[in-house]
Regions:
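Short hydrophobic/aromatic patches on the structural cores and recognition surfaces of FHA
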Residues: 17, 33, 56
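Short beta-strand His + acidic residue motifs that chelate non-heme Fe in jelly-roll/DSBH
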Residues: 1-2, 21-22, 38, 44-50
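Short, surface-exposed secondary-structure boundary micro-motifs
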Residues: 41-42, 61
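Double-stranded beta-helix
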Residues: 47-100
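Structural motif
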Residues: 11, 18-20, 27, 43, ...
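Short acidic-glycine-tyrosine-enriched beta hairpin
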Residues: 25-40
Length: 100
């Protein structure tokens, strides 16, 4: 999922796999059973860095329309770090490549 933010707060819960979560200027590896809280307005990106699918649940609050949902449903959401548009103002480029 490429860099994005929204007005709602959200929580990601990793069900399976390994990902790299970039949250503002923070970068961390997340694995099965972990959760990440994302405050409103904070730019973030999640990238699958494992060899298996990354499955997660996420929830937003309060309810509302989130722009990247429409992109996901239409199949136009760019992959993180691949064919990505320019970073939005405030986003950090530290998660554009897989860690070595």
């Amino acid at each position: 999922m490429p860099w994005h933010n929204q007005e709602q707060e959200e929580i990601y819960f990793v069900i399976e796999g390994t990902g790299e979560m970039c949250l503002g200027q923070e970068r961390q590896t997340v694995t099965s059973g972990q959760a990440v809280y994302i405050p409103p307005g904070v730019f973030h990106q999640l990238t699958n860095i494992g060899d298996t699918p990354l499955r997660m649940l996420y929830c937003y609050g309060p309810a509302g329309d989130v722009a990247h949902w429409r992109q996901e449903l239409s199949g136009t959401l760019p992959k993180a770090g691949v064919d990505a548009p320019p970073l939005p103002a405030g986003a950090q480029p530290q998660c554009m490549e897989k860690p070595v």
